[in-house]
Amino acid sequence: MSKKVDISVIILSHNTEILLRACLISLLKARRGELHIQTIVVDNASTDRSIQIVKKEFPWVELVESRKNLGYSGGNNLGLKKVKGEYILFLNSDVEIKPIALVRMKQFMDRDAKIGASTPKVELFRGGMDPDCHRGFPTPLASLTYFLGLEKVFPKSRIFGQYHQFYLDLEIPHEIDSGFGTFMFVRSKTLKMVGNWDERYFFYGEDIDLFYRIKQAGWKVMYYPETLALHHKGASSGLRKESQGVTVASKEIRLKTAKASIEAMEIFYKKFYKGKYNSLITMIVLAGIKIKGLFRLLKFSLSF
């Protein structure tokens, strides 16, 4: 009789062979005897040595190969077809976890059946906390104050700091709106209730969408800083300076992800907020997204 799977880990990878190896080594150290862990790596049409490395060095991994880059949502949904665990951990290939992380996250979720998803404190390899592990939902006001830079000036303000909610105590566990797809620990029955990742998002925004649906369904989303993950932010997309040298994201992929980051804002707003705000606010928000997109693509084109 096969053992019950406690946690199914899905790691999505596209041309991150160096980081993927480090991620899997850290996961191996976290595969403690008291937990039965299923590990699934979904390769999103990599052209580097990622597939060969997984097959040769990590035979305990279930490898799923996609001939096409399905994006973040599509790739994770492909991995979900193999899931057997009571819990699911969506883990980026550019993340390394602490040896005790999985045990602690499961224990935390076990203590409260109303928690649908949680995320730990995520720190950047270059230093400091990754703010995206602790977010409010991107309402028009939260987004406006964030993009105008008011959150940086007044990070503890409940009016100007809604985007990352840094007015809350970051050293103790508490409920939040949205965590981070980089390390997203979800109860399997929660995901069955709310549905899989929305594949209209290619890259960016899909994690906030999923957290939003989890909250809508009445589950709690928790920030749990008593365990830690380390993040090479931007390595998967190749959009950030610190990703250079550790990823081989092509110019085509980087342009596609830059466009997707803007499209995600529009998809999310139309899906969840269009009916909540009047037509004038909606017109202003959508126009703002278009303008933001033009500036982002201009900045991208000037970097080459």
Which role does the model predict for each range below?
Residues 169-196, 200-230:
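A short, conserved alpha-helix in the catalytic core of glycosyltransferases
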Residues 96-134:
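Conserved donor NDP-sugar-binding/catalytic core segment of glycosyltransferases
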Residues 65-83, 93, 104:
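Glycine-rich, basic loop-to-helix element that forms the pyrophosphate-binding segment
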Residues 26, 43-51, 68:
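A conserved acidic beta->alpha catalytic loop
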Residues 137-176:
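Short, flexible, basic/aromatic active-site loop/helix in glycosyltransferases
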Residues 1-29:
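N-proximal low-complexity "stem/linker" segments adjacent to membrane-targeting elements
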Residues 88:
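Short aromatic/hydrophobic "clamp" motif used to bind/position activated sugar donors
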Residues 212-302:
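Active-site-adjacent helix/loop segment of glycosyltransferases
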